[in-house]
């Protein structure tokens, strides 16, 4: 290992920049997140080509254990340049990496069977959550087994505190765990049947609370029907008991209104339509054998049973469009089917690689110097995970670039025509993946507990039977290698490297404008803007890569300097017109998710992006439509409703806002966003006070056109901190230039008597 060649960051970045054809963000993300490194920060790969050879060689090693193995060269050709098949982050980082003892799984769910509301059970889950996060996994678990607030307990407390304090405990644990420079990811869920579900729903509305977790409510059909019809609904604990300890009737409509309001206000909670999830779940055909689904992974695309895990992989849909953005555009279904079959095979190989990694983790635990009492809990955790992984062999084959595929085919995202085409693609994917799993069952054996009889009435299996009777007959005869196969994940950083839209989502913005500082004396410099201190800036256009391809295909000059009006006109001519994240037809997007969901055996991670000025009635309408359309879950994000999230810069005019509230079909083109890189001398400012690890802090949020532009933070009420009257909530941040040319930022506010006070040097 000491003989391996190492590279500096600059060497790897330069090679990767060339690999990604000048895409700085893609190059930087790859070097920072996915290049093979050791714990000292040494980099052992120069570009993604090195990584793909590493992955191909390891997967080919597993292939040799079985009949008809794929070669390393064939596997590399599928991975190269992120063109066809892209493993998710954990497999990309971990496969063949001997420098880290970490899992290849992207996500886990944990839970305790039986009585799990004791302090011991709650603490056990806390420990297991941390142990998994330190191995790079995201974690989900359900809180429905914790007894509600005020119920008797047999300890000195006399009554239960309810589940909200434990939400905060699990959230804080997440924030403590570092995963290669990022904190852990956590999903907390609770059943709407639980008497504390309202407190759960409100928990994140208090600033600074439960900041380390996503939260989702598991909603059953009975509740949805009661909410729509304004009928009472019964909550109880235990939630599935015929003889509950606690039982109460509530107004379903009122509680539903709170869910809608909170989602509108803060983008949480998400909703999980639990009856749909369980009804459609193939693993739940084996619920009595330990495969009862209890929660989801942090992004919601994989519902899981306790101690099961999943590895993810995406197929780049754009790469199967021949002659993209032309009248001759055609989707190559035959090549797509071949590659999906190989993707499913690669995913099964990655399970074997994960089982090897688990053995290494368990060996490390055994050899750690701690006493056996301390090590036992972690060791037993990985024993349970290994057992579930080998019994079910669950996979997560998904897609990315749906939005670009639709545009390349000359369709508009959010139309019925585009939805119908997408459903055809996902039906093809599902049948090809399941056919591959059946073929592997012939060669490698079915998953350990396969039973055709148990699955006979599962809706997803019945759709396969109707669509491909021969596949169904073969599955009855040979079984299936994997208990479940499919998902659609967000693919955030993955899509940066494929240089496409992410997951099932439309493009965020096809084109936007930026400014960069230039020397006006340099040759070929075009000065578009000079700030108040005399610095010169040049404006330049940033194109979404596939929008740029549309321009090239249609003979549009990509080097020309376009005006704002010309860019708007170009967007209006393109298939990305009215098809960005914020201006698609939102109801059609939800219906599209529901239609595709019928061909995805796990779930789909989708966010419906809404403008800031939509009302709660629209959120309600979208959630109800998601339930009726067969979605397994739904997440709403209203622009500006959550701090720390990228938001749109421009405001929409009043006429368009009125149309959006009615979910209008015919909306004007969204104007080009101008990303301002030169701040004005003064910015309006909001003052936010918060706690960080029990310390009091203050944040100054500079606003440009009413939206966050910059933020300064510091300790308050401390000798070296920032002292402000508690009544101060607004002011100005002023950029100052000192005589020596140094810049500083001052905060200025008015006191109750109208006098201005300035705090220098934020």
Place the predicted regions along the sequence by residue.
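Gly/Pro-rich turn-and-neighbor structural signature
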Residues: 60-113, 120, 234-262, 266-271, ...
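Catalytic alpha/beta core of large soluble enzyme barrels
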Residues: 24, 300-302, 354, 461, ...
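Function-dense linear segments that define catalytic or interfacial modules
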Residues: 36, 58-65, 78-155, 163-166, ...
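Short, Gly/Pro- and small/polar-rich lid/capping loops
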Residues: 471-477, 648-703
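Conserved catalytic alpha/beta cores of large enzymes that bind or transform nucleotide phosphates
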Residues: 160-164, 174-262, 269, 323, ...
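Acidic/polar, glycine-rich intrinsically disordered N-terminal extensions of enzymes
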Residues: 1-104, 256-265, 624, 628, ...
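Internal maturation/activation junctions in enzymes
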Residues: 75-76, 236-239, 339-386, 390, ...
């Amino acid at each position: 290992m000491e003989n391996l060649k190492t590279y500096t960051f600059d060497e790897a970045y330069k090679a990767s920049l060339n690999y990604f054809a000048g895409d700085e963000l893609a190059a930087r993300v790859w070097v920072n997140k996915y290049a093979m490194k050791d714990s000292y920060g040494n980099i052992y790969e120069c570009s993604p080509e090195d990584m793909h050879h590493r992955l191909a060689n390891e997967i080919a090693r597993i292939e040799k254990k079985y009949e008809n193995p794929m070669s390393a060269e064939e596997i590399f050709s599928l991975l190269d340049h992120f063109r066809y098949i892209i493993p998710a982050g954990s497999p990309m980082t971990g496969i063949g990496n001997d420098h880290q003892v970490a899992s290849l799984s992207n996500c886990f769910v944990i839970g305790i069977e039986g009585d799990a509301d004791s302090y011991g059970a709650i603490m056990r889950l806390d420990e297991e959550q941390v142990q998994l996060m330190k191995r790079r996994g995201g974690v989900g678990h359900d809180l429905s087994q914790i007894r509600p607030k005020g119920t008797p307990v047999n300890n000195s407390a006399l009554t239960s505190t309810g589940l909200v304090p434990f939400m905060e405990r699990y959230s804080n644990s997440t924030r403590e765990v570092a995963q290669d420079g990022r904190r852990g990811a956590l999903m907390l869920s609770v059943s709407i049947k639980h008497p504390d579900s309202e407190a759960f729903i409100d928990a994140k509305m208090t600033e600074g609370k439960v900041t380390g977790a996503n939260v989702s409510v598991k909603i059953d059909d009975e509740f949805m029907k009661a909410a729509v019809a304004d009928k009472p609904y019964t909550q109880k604990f235990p939630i599935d008991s015929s003889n509950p300890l606690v039982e109460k009737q509530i107004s379903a409509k009122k509680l539903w209104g709170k869910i809608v309001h909170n989602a509108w206000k803060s983008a949480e909670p998400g909703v999980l339509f639990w009856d749909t999830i369980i009804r459609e779940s193939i693993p739940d055909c084996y619920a009595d054998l330990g495969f009862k689904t209890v929660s989801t992974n942090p992004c919601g695309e994989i519902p899981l049973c306790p101690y099961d895990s999943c590895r993810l992989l995406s197929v780049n849909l754009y790469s199967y469009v021949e002659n993209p953005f032309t009248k001759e555009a055609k989707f190559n279904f035959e090549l797509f089917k071949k590659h999906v079959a190989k993707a499913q095979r690669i995913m099964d190989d990655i399970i074997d690689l994960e089982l090897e990694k688990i053995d290494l983790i368990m060996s490390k635990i055994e050899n750690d110097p701690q006493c056996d009492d301390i090590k036992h809990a972690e060791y037993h955790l990985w024993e349970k995970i290994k057992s579930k992984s080998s019994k079910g062999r669950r996979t997560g084959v998904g897609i990315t670039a749906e939005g670009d595929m639709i545009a390349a085919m000359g369709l508009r995202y959010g139309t019925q025509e585009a939805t119908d085409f997408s459903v055809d693609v996902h039906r093809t994917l599902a049948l090809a993946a399941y056919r591959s799993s059946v073929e592997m069952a012939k060669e490698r054996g079915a998953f350990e507990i396969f039973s055709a009889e148990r699955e006979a009435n599962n809706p997803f299996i019945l759709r396969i039977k109707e669509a491909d009777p021969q596949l169904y007959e073969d599955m009855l005869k040979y079984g299936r290698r994997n208990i479940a196969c499919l998902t659609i994940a967000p693919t955030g950083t993955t899509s940066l490297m494929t240089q496409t839209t992410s997951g099932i989502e439309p493009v965020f913005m096809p084109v936007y404008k930026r400014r960069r500082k230039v020397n006006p004396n340099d040759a070929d410099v075009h000065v578009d803007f000079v700030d108040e201190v005399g610095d010169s800036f040049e404006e330049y256009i940033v194109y979404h890569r596939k929008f740029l391809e549309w321009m090239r295909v249609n003979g549009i000059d990509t080097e020309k300097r376009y005006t704002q009006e010309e860019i708007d006109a170009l967007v209006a001519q393109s298939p990305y017109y009215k098809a960005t994240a914020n201006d698609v037809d939102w109801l059609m997007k939800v219906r599209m998710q529901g239609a595709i969901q019928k061909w995805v055996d796990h779930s789909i991670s989708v966010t419906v992006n809404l403008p800031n000025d939509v009302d709660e009635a629209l959120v309600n309408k979208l959630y109800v439509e998601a339930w009726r359309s067969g979605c397994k879950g739904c997440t709403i994000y209203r622009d500006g409703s959550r701090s720390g999230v990228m938001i749109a810069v421009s405001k929409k005019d009043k006429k368009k806002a009125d149309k959006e509230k009615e979910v209008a079909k015919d909306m004007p083109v969204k104007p080009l966003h101008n990303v301002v890189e030169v701040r004005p001398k003064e910015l309006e400012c909001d003052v936010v006070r918060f706690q960080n690890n029990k310390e009091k802090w203050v944040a100054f949020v500079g606003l440009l056109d009413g939206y966050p532009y910059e933020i300064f933070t510091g300790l308050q009420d401390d000798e070296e901190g920032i002292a402000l009257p508690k009544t101060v909530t607004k002011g100005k941040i002023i950029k100052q230039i000192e005589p020596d040319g140094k810049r500083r930022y001052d905060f200025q506010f008015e006191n109750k008597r109208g006098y201005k006070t300035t705090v220098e040097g934020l």
